[in-house]
A protein has these predicted regions:
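Short, small-residue-biased leader/transition segments that mark boundaries at the very start
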Residues: 1-6
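N-terminal "mature-chain" segments and other terminal, solvent-exposed stretches
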Residues: 11-14, 77
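Short leucine-rich amphipathic alpha-helices used at interfaces
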Residues: 30-31, 37-38, 75, 81
Length: 84
């Protein structure tokens, strides 16, 4: 039923949000192993979301490749946002 689809999608989206938050927290810590694990968890659940929506991972990669090919696609960092 439609409510089952909504519940499943809601559960997946909540998990993606949780993993995104955990990735942000790990990024602020000094442990790169923790960060790698959290990025892995986030990507896994994003892939689950894609599969649930019938979206092939290759379609996501295609968009990434298109963005990399665009000239001037780099965002300008604020002074406080620049990476060292």
């Amino acid at each position: 039923a439609a409510s089952d689809v909504y519940k499943r999608q809601d559960k997946i989206c909540k998990k993606v949000g949780e993993e995104a938050a955990e990735t942000i927290i790990a990024a602020k810590n000094a442990d790169n192993d923790e960060l790698k694990n959290e990025i892995n968890d986030l990507l896994y659940h994003v892939m689950v979301l894609c599969a649930d929506r019938g979206l092939e991972w290759s379609e996501v990669e295609e968009v990434l490749n298109e963005r990399n090919e665009k000239i001037g696609n780099l965002k300008q960092f604020h002074t406080t946002d620049k990476l060292s």
